[in-house]
């Protein structure tokens, strides 16, 4: 079975839900991973996704962050295998959702992340970003061992060149 996977930083699902639903209808994407939902799970209209043939699993947070993985029917989540945030890393922010998807007779591990933006090296946010990335690096080998079919995707918030950002002067 062939699948298509797309990742999209929506910068507010509340604002972009119509465009996301249009995208799903037009592309018949197998798996869509969203970042920067900026809303809690309870506020997401999961029925709207179901209506167009998709199942949604989200890990949200009011106003900031949040990730969601959306599957086209007949793909299904294995809910007992879901992980929210990096195990062993205390984090009040909703930044990572690891789900397992049944694809025919195979399992696919989808790790959807909204990686921290460390801003500049001098920023007080930079040590948090480095600690988060280190925790991810420490956790990933166990995931690869358990799930040989694994995809890590999302908004990595890494911009090595000016052309990688919207406004390099800011």
Residue positions per predicted region:
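Soluble or luminal CAZymes and related metallo-dependent hydrolases
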Residues: 12-16, 91-93, 128-136
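Short glycine-enriched, charge-decorated loop/helix-capping segments at active-site entrances
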Residues: 123-127, 167-170
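Active-site-proximal beta-strand elements of phosphoester/diester hydrolases
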Residues: 2-12, 107-122, 153
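Structured beta-strand-rich core segments of catalytic domains in phosphoester-bond hydrolases
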Residues: 37-38, 44-120
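Short amphipathic alpha-helices and their capping/turn segments at secondary-structure boundaries
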Residues: 22-24, 95-105, 135-148
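N-terminal, active-site-proximal structural segment of metallo-dependent hydrolase catalytic domains
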Residues: 1-54, 64-67, 160
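Active-site neighborhood of phospho(di)ester-bond hydrolases with catalytic His/Asp-centered motifs
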Residues: 32-35, 58, 152-154
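Metal-dependent phosphoesterases centered on the DNase I-like endonuclease/exonuclease/phosphatase
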Residues: 52, 132-170
């Amino acid at each position: 079975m062939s699948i298509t996977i797309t990742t999209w930083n929506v910068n507010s699902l509340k604002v972009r839900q119509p465009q996301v639903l249009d995208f799903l209808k037009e592309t018949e994407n197998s798996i869509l991973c969203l970042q920067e939902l900026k809303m809690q799970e309870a506020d997401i209209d999961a029925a709207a996704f179901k209506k167009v043939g998709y199942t949604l699993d989200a890990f949200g947070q009011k106003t900031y962050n949040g990730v969601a993985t959306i599957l086209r029917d007949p793909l299904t989540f294995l809910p007992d295998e879901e992980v929210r945030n990096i195990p062993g890393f205390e984090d009040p922010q909703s930044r990572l959702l690891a789900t397992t998807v049944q694809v025919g007779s195979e399992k696919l591990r989808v790790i959807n992340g909204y990686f921290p933006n460390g801003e500049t090296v001098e920023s007080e946010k930079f040590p948090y970003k480095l600690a988060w990335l280190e925790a991810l690096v420490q956790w990933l080998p166990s995931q690869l061992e358990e799930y040989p079919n694994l995809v890590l995707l999302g908004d990595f918030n890494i911009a090595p060149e000016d052309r990688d950002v919207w406004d390099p002067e800011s």
